[in-house]
């Protein structure tokens, strides 16, 4: 499941601490019931319900929440003092809510090593859930990977190797140029997700090729920078967009999955969760999933996890921790084996996900291989801004960087305007 991008988190973060709590109906007490809320699909929730019902010693109740209205419902529950004992949250939500004092600090529970062990989380995943002071206000759960879905027939026709672990940025750009030459009327690389052409995507290119990241540290940054390698990466991408070799940052990728599954494009950028949608469309060609390209200096792969958070006024942290710990291993192993949506940041909980993929076809196995590779790579880049200025920074990117990358404004001027605009927000 992709991370939640709803802006209603701002409504939640603006509430006073007094408005947050488990509530008498939702709060778990010793021997009572622990409540939680997800944004997952009906099928995934049903699979999770079956597994969570097996937990002994404490009751578990999932609160209903329509996927599309999740953030709004969460805000309403906090306002009415009926927030569940734990709830699905994105990394950016967690950082913003924690900054307002609205979340429970799980640091002491993780330190005990009872239920979950710190060294069993995938590299770097826990660090993004700690605030600048090192407190842990959320536990990472479902991990997203991002990469390139490819149509093998199109690559074979153009006499190109299919993308695979270890391919490079130079190969990516050479491939889409060759694919464009083979079929001038088509756009070879289509974005079903905006990350590739975002500042973070360009930052990944920069770091992989020996440059600096756009933010020095993912949490607690007070400025962004765009060095010469970042600008060189942006220039390469802008040229590819102008040549019609890839879609622009504002492209609406709503129909991209269906088009890819029907053989309408050689390459589609997106997350591993699109696997199920592609499969449901029953493609009649060989396809697979490859990770981000390597640069001249290193391979840098994305790190992004969703997680669970609890209200600061949590009534029963002992039993809540017990439920979360059970879910991270048994709950997710059983659920993801039935509904293979994502690997789990807590590595012992990913067994079911990988078993489901390895039992599938070659495409499913390629997704398993890419997910394993991306999660295990040491060098990572963060897929979004996480600091409190992150939401308005998105507006700055949309009016400065995106038009410049699309060729509507001078590129370096657009980058400079983005840097200046975000740094002004970060300085407040």
Model-derived segments and spans:
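Conserved N-terminal structural module of periplasmic/extracytoplasmic solute-binding proteins
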Residues: 2-100, 112-118, 162, 283, ...
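Short helix-initiation/N-cap motifs at beta->coil->alpha
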Residues: 64-73, 92, 167-173, 248-261
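Hinge/lid segment of periplasmic solute-binding proteins
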Residues: 92-145, 288, 365, 372
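Short, solvent-exposed loop/beta-turn-alpha elements that line the ligand-binding surface or hinge
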Residues: 107-121, 165, 187-193, 211-232, ...
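C-terminal lobe and pocket-closing loops
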Residues: 111, 274-284, 296-303, 309-395
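Extracytoplasmic/periplasmic solute-binding protein
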Residues: 132-141, 146, 170-222, 229, ...
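Glycine-centered hinge/linker elements that transmit conformational signals in sensory
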Residues: 175-176, 219-249
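Extracytoplasmic/periplasmic substrate-binding proteins
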Residues: 201-208, 235-319
């Amino acid at each position: 499941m992709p991370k939640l991008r709803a802006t209603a988190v701002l409504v939640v973060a603006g509430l006073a601490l007094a408005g947050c709590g488990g509530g008498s109906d939702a709060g778990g007490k010793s021997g009572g019931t622990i409540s939680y809320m997800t944004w997952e699909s009906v099928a995934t929730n049903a699979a999770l319900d079956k597994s969570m019902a097996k937990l002994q010693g404490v009751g578990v109740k999932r609160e209903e929440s329509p996927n599309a209205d999740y953030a709004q419902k969460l805000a309403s529950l906090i306002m009415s003092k009926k927030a569940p004992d734990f709830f699905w949250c994105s990394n950016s939500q967690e950082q913003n809510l924690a900054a307002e004092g609205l979340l429970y600090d799980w640091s002491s529970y993780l330190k005990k090593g009872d239920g979950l062990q710190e060294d069993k989380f995938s590299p770097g995943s826990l660090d993004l859930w700690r605030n600048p002071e090192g407190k842990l206000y959320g536990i990472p759960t479902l991990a997203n990977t991002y990469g390139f879905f490819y149509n093998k027939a199109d690559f074979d026709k153009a006499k190109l190797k299919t993308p695979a672990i270890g391919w490079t940025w130079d190969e990516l750009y050479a491939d889409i140029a060759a694919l464009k030459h083979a079929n001038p009327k088509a756009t070879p690389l289509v974005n079903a997700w905006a990350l590739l052409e975002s500042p973070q995507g360009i930052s990944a290119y920069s770091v992989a090729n020996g440059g600096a990241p756009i933010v020095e540290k993912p949490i607690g940054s007070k400025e962004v920078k765009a060095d010469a390698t970042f600008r060189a990466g942006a220039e390469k991408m802008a040229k590819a967009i102008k040549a019609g070799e890839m879609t622009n940052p504002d492209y609406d990728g709503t129909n991209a999955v269906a088009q890819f599954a029907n053989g309408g494009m050689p390459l589609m950028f997106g997350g591993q969760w699109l696997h199920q949608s592609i499969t449901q469309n029953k493609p009649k060609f060989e396809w697979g999933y490859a990770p981000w390209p390597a640069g001249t200096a290193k391979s840098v792969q994305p790190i992004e996890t969703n997680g669970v958070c609890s209200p600061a006024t949590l009534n029963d942290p002992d039993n809540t921790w017990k439920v979360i710990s059970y879910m991270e291993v048994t709950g997710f192993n059983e659920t993801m084996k039935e509904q293979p949506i994502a690997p789990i940041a807590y590595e012992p909980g990913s067994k079911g996900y990988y078993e489901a993929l390895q039992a599938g076809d070659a495409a499913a196995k390629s997704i398993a291989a890419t997910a394993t590779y991306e999660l295990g790579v040491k060098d990572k880049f963060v897929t979004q801004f996480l600091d409190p200025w992150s939401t308005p920074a998105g507006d700055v990117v949309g009016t400065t960087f995106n038009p410049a990358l699309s060729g509507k404004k001078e590129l370096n001027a657009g980058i400079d305007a983005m840097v200046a605009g975000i740094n002004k927000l970060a300085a407040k």
